[in-house]
């Protein structure tokens, strides 16, 4: 299977997102890489499902709460930016204050 570097990056984000999802389901608090992967993967999947940039910007703020991540993580992530592929091309999705 020949994948472009961009496809490899998306696959890595998706895989790390699955690990984070499983840990969250077990009641574990997510660390920084897990938090980034969880939110990024959800945004990429949302774009694939046809959501708009504006919808994803809001959706990204609803995925995790302070109680679901380790102490200090919300302050480490003032925003998340993900390049997602939409039906009309690639766009940058920015989520400000993703963890409320």
From Swiss-Prot:
<comment type="subunit">
    <text>Heterotrimer of UreA (gamma), UreB (beta) and UreC (alpha) subunits. Three heterotrimers associate to form the active enzyme.</text>
</comment>
<comment type="similarity">
    <text>Belongs to the urease gamma subunit family.</text>
</comment>
<dbReference type="GO" id="GO:0005737">
    <property type="term" value="C:cytoplasm"/>
</dbReference>
<protein>
    <recommendedName>
        <fullName>Urease subunit gamma</fullName>
        <ecNumber>3.5.1.5</ecNumber>
    </recommendedName>
</protein>
<comment type="pathway">
    <text>Nitrogen metabolism; urea degradation; CO(2) and NH(3) from urea (urease route): step 1/1.</text>
</comment>
<keyword id="KW-0378">Hydrolase</keyword>
<dbReference type="GO" id="GO:0016151">
    <property type="term" value="F:nickel cation binding"/>
</dbReference>
<dbReference type="GO" id="GO:0009039">
    <property type="term" value="F:urease activity"/>
</dbReference>
<dbReference type="InterPro" id="IPR036463">
    <property type="entry name" value="Urease_gamma_sf"/>
</dbReference>
<keyword id="KW-0963">Cytoplasm</keyword>
<dbReference type="GO" id="GO:0043419">
    <property type="term" value="P:urea catabolic process"/>
</dbReference>
<dbReference type="Pfam" id="PF00547">
    <property type="entry name" value="Urease_gamma"/>
</dbReference>
<dbReference type="InterPro" id="IPR002026">
    <property type="entry name" value="Urease_gamma/gamma-beta_su"/>
</dbReference>
<dbReference type="InterPro" id="IPR050069">
    <property type="entry name" value="Urease_subunit"/>
</dbReference>
<dbReference type="InterPro" id="IPR012010">
    <property type="entry name" value="Urease_gamma"/>
</dbReference>
């Amino acid at each position: 299977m020949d994948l472009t570097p961009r496809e490899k990056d998306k696959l890595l984000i998706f895989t790390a997102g699955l690990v984070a999802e499983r840990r969250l389901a077990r009641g574990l608090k997510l660390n920084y890489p897990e938090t980034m992967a969880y939110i990024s993967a959800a945004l990429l999947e949302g774009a694939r499902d046809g959501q708009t940039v504006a919808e994803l910007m809001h959706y990204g703020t609803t995925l995790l709460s302070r109680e679901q991540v380790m102490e200090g993580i919300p302050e480490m992530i003032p925003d998340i930016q993900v390049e997602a592929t939409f039906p009309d091309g690639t766009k940058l999705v920015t989520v400000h204050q993703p963890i409320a």
